[in-house]
Amino acid sequence: MTQLAIGKPAPLGAHYDGQGVNFTLFSAHAERVELCVFDANGQEHRYDLPGHSGDIWHGYLPDARPGLRYGYRVHGPWQPAEGHRFNPAKLLIDPCARQIDGEFKDNPLLHAGHNEPDYRDNAAIAPKCVVVVDHYDWEDDAPPRTPWDSTIIYEAHVKGLTYLHPEIPVEIRGTYKALGHPVMINYLKQLGITALELLPVAQFASEPRLQRMGLSNYWGYNPVAMFALHPAYACSPETALDEFRDAIKALHKAGIEVILDIVLNHSAELDLDGPLFSLRGIDNRSYYWIREDGDYHNWTGCGNTLNLSHPAVVDYASACLRYWVETCHVDGFRFDLAAVMGRTPEFRQDAPLFTAIQNCPVLSQVKLIAEPWDIAPGGYQVGNFPPLFAEWNDHFRDAARRFWLHYDLPLGAFAGRFAASSDVFKRNGRLPSAAINLVTAHDGFTLRDCVCFNHKHNEANGEENRDGTNNNYSNNHGKEGLGGSLDLVERRRDSIHALLTTLLLSQGTPMLLAGDEHGHSQHGNNNAYCQDNQLTWLDWSQASSGLTAFTAALIHLRKRIPALVENRWWEEGDGNVRWLNRYAQPLSTDEWQNGPKQLQILLSDRFLIAINATLEVTEIVLPAGEWHAIPPFAGEDNPVITAVWQGPAHGLCVFQR
């Protein structure tokens, strides 16, 4: 049998050099590491990794080639109270594997044991890593590098976006290839999108609980191999990487950036009753935050929490991010439950991973977006991330919904959110673009459901409607569910228009949820993470062309307003913004706090947003000048208005002079 040479301790993972493959694995507490390779017949061959440099185990297998399937068996103590759960009976995934062969099924053999180790061998059914070689012609690809102040983000699911699109070839619908199809790219361009933000594409597993109910993890926030693409989105698993890069190259040629939603807060190994795939068996004590009793700190709600203050885990996370930028040319990341990135265990702006990103010449140059919270004490960190990061602005989401959907909200609070939440983000040299404004996202109601449902309807998730938030700030306008009278449909449409206008004409970086622009509904499910079906797939045949045109016109209008595309904070008297009451006078202190929901926002001294969010038709006295409504608010008859606008109940209009 071929003997392993010592090889090199870097880089981590399996790397083919034309003559053989170098294997490296981090484990600070292992006593022995076996490389297990599998031939075409599934026969396993084991080799002890002979190299041991610090905490890196390594070896070189001569004559090994791309396509080789492999895994690891890691020997060490079984001491649960100390956080050690080594079990060499279990084949483990390389954390840096770039392709996985096999499925992560619910099987007792894929568990290590809870209090006592399960010594049943699982190599016959365990997924295997695959050695890959990287040859790809990027041609003249270059990142668009869209400035933050010109960025319009579109959050989408790879499968859900295109699976039902009638103009995309059936054989590629729901895949990476479909993202780069001319029909999809033309649609995004016409809409005005500059950045496509994809829900997780790194390989993930469905939780055993979901599998037992006949469901699956649709969103992908359950990662198992952070360097490998999820194969279900590929036409062929063997060509997934090239399919993904082809799509990115096509999107870049159209000037559209690609941002990946990435999960660096927990793994698919879940809690101590969860499956054993990789990290738990390689070095549980190093990779996870461990309590004094040996259990996990569950700061994510997913059973475990990655210890991103450990130097080796910081190196692992940094290498993962660099891989996606350097190998796939992605333009940025949205970090799920990003407060975990700053835990030491207290949240710190100078936490090791933040520092590593800031000091990296690659990662410091891409777009970085934080979901700025986790579920632990002190986990809500909106506004507290380092200056390189933009952040999801849930203050904006809640304020926009409360203002337009008949909840109490003072004008001052609404104006503050409209002005990029300067009270939250104007610190440490940050600019207005740091506020990622959103009204909806993948988790929560869609925009249409916000105006059709007062309550969540998550029964299909199998948890008796207990899952998902109850704080939706939604309004069904008098009838629970879709459909209704013409008057009801029109009132809901007006609310959708108002929310979209607030989102797309406010200061900050807007993020639009895919499907909101044509009225997609999840029938009241506000936590559709396990619904891989018509509930979440966008039905393009039912798309509202009128709403799509309205959204595109708003985005086009946004790009014409200097106050919205100049990335600087609005100051009193700078000509960017004036806040006026219904009589075109500056608002008094009392009006800011107690006045009716009537407001005029004058932007760049030429564009006026007139708002009447009350339930009564109200005369709005416009500022001096000749005003005319502009698309998408202008009708065929668009007379010049010089004095008064008859503001319909729950309405708004945008004028230019």
UniProtKB/Swiss-Prot annotation:
EC number: 3.2.1.196
Basic and acidic residues composition bias: residue spans: 458-467
Pathway entry: Glycan degradation; glycogen degradation
Biological processes, Gene Ontology terms: glycogen catabolic process
Top enzyme class: hydrolase
Active site (record annotation): 336 (nucleophile), 371 (proton donor)
Site location (Transition state stabilizer): 443
GO MF: glycogen debranching enzyme activity; hydrolase activity, hydrolyzing O-glycosyl compounds
Catalyzed reactions per annotation: Hydrolysis of (1->6)-alpha-D-glucosidic linkages to branches with degrees of polymerization of three or four glucose residues in limit dextrin
UniProtKB keywords: Carbohydrate metabolism, Glycogen metabolism, Glycosidase, Hydrolase
Region (Disordered): 458-479
Family of the protein in this entry: Belongs to the glycosyl hydrolase 13 family.
Function text: Removes maltotriose and maltotetraose chains that are attached by 1,6-alpha-linkage to the limit dextrin main chain, generating a debranched limit dextrin.
Name the record gives this protein: Glycogen debranching enzyme
Name of the gene this protein is made from: glgX
